[in-house]
Amino acid sequence: MEVFMDSTHTFIQIHPKDNTAVALTSLKKDSVLNLDGRMYTLLEDIPQGHKFALEKISAGSAVIKYGSPIGYATEEIPAGSWIHTHNMKTGLGDLLEYSYQKEFTSLEPQEERFFEGYRRTDGKAGVRNEIWIIPTVGCVNSIATSVAARAKEFQPDSVDAIVAFPHPYGCSQMGDDQEHTRQILADLIRHPNAAGVLVLGLGCENSNIEELKKYIGAVDEDRVKFLVAQEVEDEIEASLACIRQLCDYASTFQREKISCKELVIGMKCGGSDGLSGITANPTVGAFSDLLIARGGTTILTEVPEMFGAETLLMNRCRDEAVFDKTVDLINSFKNYFKSHNQTIYENPSPGNKKGGISTLEDKSLGCTQKSGSAPVADVLSYGQPVQTKGLNLLSAPGNDLVASTALAASGAQIVLFTTGRGTPFASPVPTVKISSNSKLYENKKNWIDFNCGALVDGGSIPEMGESLFDYVLEVASGRPVKAEEAGFHDMAIFKQGVTL
């Protein structure tokens, strides 16, 4: 029998109200644990990231984690027992009635910090000097990728990357899907990380260049080039000629000192485990507070992973108008699920469950740790550019690539992506992979940029948040993330309706 007297390195009770604790390392049956003088004997093995009961939980009673219910016991759970999907279930139902119960404190202003970025002619700040090739329709994807590959032969050092963003849409779409495609493409065309953009069309698609221009608005003709493949003899050579001009234009920009208040940072998680809500997500939350306290902006999305934690965000809304928008954000996504005859609460993936996440409430309460403690300043519809500094909520699904693309489309120059299982994906902007556990960091150093697993062995969330803030300023100043070093750039658009 082992006796663990130092709970800091073996398990944690996240909130004083919790009737559960989380194993920070794998714990063996019959181990005796000490929590502030209270002794617990484990009745079974507890894998890392998984929960065990700190007291007897009767059948039908709430299982408490993060100070909030994450479901209810389906049978009596003795103290020291493993708690997971075999003995607990979600408590979520359908639409709820909400009331505004204001509960937040404003952040104390922090000393201004700076990064070395690119000042665009429209006044926006970018963190990369790239050339983007944006197809209007999937029919020209191969042309776009071929042009990007060939253009690398003459890419100047002043250009960070020449990237194509293929996608399967732009035609055979109707209604909201067609609107979403046009809006997201227009958002990316205007993004400040792109020094120059080639908009590549076919000519006969629904979202043709003339239609897309209505969404883009006025453009700098030196920065944005348009090419219709059906209207030129050799679309490859014509595209390459455009890219050469864009490279010359991009070379006129140099990095300069810019205030961090101009940073817009997206926040996302995926492949989460039981430690994500204890290490990585709270660290991102601490980062978010630090940036907002300096006048910057963060965006939180993946709305289905707010279900079960939405009231915490609602009560942090800065006023009733933002509260009403947040209620609509949540209920609209619940109605989206219901319109497709899908249950609202069947979210945690097999990987989530293997990592210790038992219910959607469990996942959501961990997920929303990324929001820190700042008031919710605004709520954005899908594809809507950010307009208000501070913490913004964005309407987008939980899918990693769709949500991360939506963050970039709303103006994020960088995305912070926490994970407990690991993923190699990228988004249109630098995507910082943040591990919740050190094992992932050690095993996947070609994927992971920043490790929060060290918090299991000590250290503090505020200190880790400061370290992450310093790291993000380095990335904003040009330090490549692992996905960029691998040459990865991806995008995806939210689809809801029929395909013609």
PLM region descriptions:
Residues 2-414, 423-424, 429-500:
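Metallocofactor- and cofactor-centric catalytic cores in central/energy metabolism, strongly enriched
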Residues 419:
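Short secondary-structure boundary segments
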